């Protein structure tokens, strides 16, 4: 397997070359074991927190450099926490009809799978660059593990996040909202994820809505899914800041992926 992509919160993995076992799609993501600790003797993951807003193009260039270095054995794995200025990104399956307001913010084409998503201030973006050869070479288990990190983080704030087999990401039930047209309970997305793998090194990652301007999601059909809404921790009534979430994110990450240490010279 050379490269695979997964969208920010929708669809199945697009495997560009074969490499998955016959049981790949048999288990639900809830049933998959999500322990992704590295092989014994592996160094801890670098944990980087950037202050201020990081331009999207700059972040992608940095990810590309880090992924190449990790794949070559020249750098340790990295988790990078940051915020972007307001923007939309288009995955490889993006339908231009889902870009409702094309002039609202800059739109970036990106190599990840999937459709459109929004990034902006108040949203914690987490770029996860791990060498799955040191862990488990299982794309679906990796996606489930990232979702598990989000769910554990939310649980530490007494928020129940849930998976849905037909839509990747993490969702919260909204019983106070009107029922869906099919009679089901309303649900909002609170966290999205979208990954790409190169030589079994992951990049891109996940995002958690802490306190973004939720109106900016109206400029797109997020991941092509119009039946459900979008929420944030503050929208749910939690008086939290991004720094508070960062502490819990690291705790949850270490429970699933193993030790992480602040990068020398990094903020946080």
Swiss-Prot record:
EC class of the enzyme, as a word: transferase
Signal peptide: none
Residues that coordinate or bind substrate: 112-119, 192-194, 205-207
GO biological process, one term: protein modification process
PROSITE patterns documented for this protein: BPL_LPL_CATALYTIC, LIPB
Catalytic residues identified in the record: 223 (acyl-thioester intermediate)
Coiled-coil stretches: none
Annotated keywords: Acyltransferase, Cytoplasm, Transferase
Highest taxon, organism lineage: Bacteria
InterPro entries cross-referenced by the UniProt entry: aa-tRNA-synth_II/BPL/LPL, BPL_LPL_catalytic, Octanoyltransferase, Octanoyltransferase_CS
One Gene Ontology term, aspect cellular component: cytoplasm
Record's subcellular location: Cytoplasm
Function: Catalyzes the transfer of endogenously produced octanoic acid from octanoyl-acyl-carrier-protein onto the lipoyl domains of lipoate-dependent enzymes. Lipoyl-ACP can also act as a substrate although octanoyl-ACP is likely to be the physiological substrate.
Remaining remarks: In the reaction, the free carboxyl group of octanoic acid is attached via an amide linkage to the epsilon-amino group of a specific lysine residue of lipoyl domains of lipoate-dependent enzymes.
Family: Belongs to the LipB family.
HAMAP family linked: LipB (MF_00013)
Protein name: Octanoyltransferase
Species in which this protein is naturally found: Agrobacterium fabrum (strain C58 / ATCC 33970)
Upper taxonomic lineage: Bacteria, Pseudomonadati, Pseudomonadota, Alphaproteobacteria, Hyphomicrobiales
């Amino acid at each position: 397997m050379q490269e695979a992509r997964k969208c920010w919160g929708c669809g199945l993995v697009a495997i560009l070359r074969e490499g998955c076992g016959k049981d790949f799609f048999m288990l639900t993501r809830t049933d998959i074991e999500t322990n992704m600790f590295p092989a014994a003797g592996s160094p801890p993951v670098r944990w980087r927190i950037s202050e201020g807003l990081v331009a999207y193009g700059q972040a992608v260039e940095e990810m590309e450099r880090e992924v190449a270095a990790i794949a070559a054995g020249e750098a340790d794995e990295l988790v990078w926490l940051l915020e972007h200025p307001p923007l939309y990104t288009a995955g490889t399956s993006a339908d231009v009809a889902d870009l409702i307001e094309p002039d609202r913010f800059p739109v970036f084409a990106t190599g990840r799978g999937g459709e459109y998503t929004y990034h902006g201030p108040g949203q914690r973006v987490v770029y996860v660059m791990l060498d799955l050869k040191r862990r488990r070479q299982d794309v679906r288990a990796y996606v489930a593990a990232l979702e598990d990190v989000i769910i554990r983080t939310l649980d530490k704030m007494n928020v129940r996040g849930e998976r849905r087999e037909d839509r990747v990401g993490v969702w919260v039930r909204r019983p106070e909202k009107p029922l869906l047209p099919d009679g089901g309970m309303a649900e909002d997305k609170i966290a999205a994820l979208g990954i790409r793998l190169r030589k079994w090194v992951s990049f891109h990652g996940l995002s958690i809505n802490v306190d973004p301007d939720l109106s900016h999601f109206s400029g797109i059909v997020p991941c092509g899914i119009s039946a459900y809404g979008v929420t944030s921790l503050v929208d749910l009534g939690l008086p939290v800041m991004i720094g508070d979430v960062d502490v819990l994110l690291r705790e949850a990450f270490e429970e699933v992926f193993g030790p992480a240490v602040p990068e020398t010279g990094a903020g946080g």
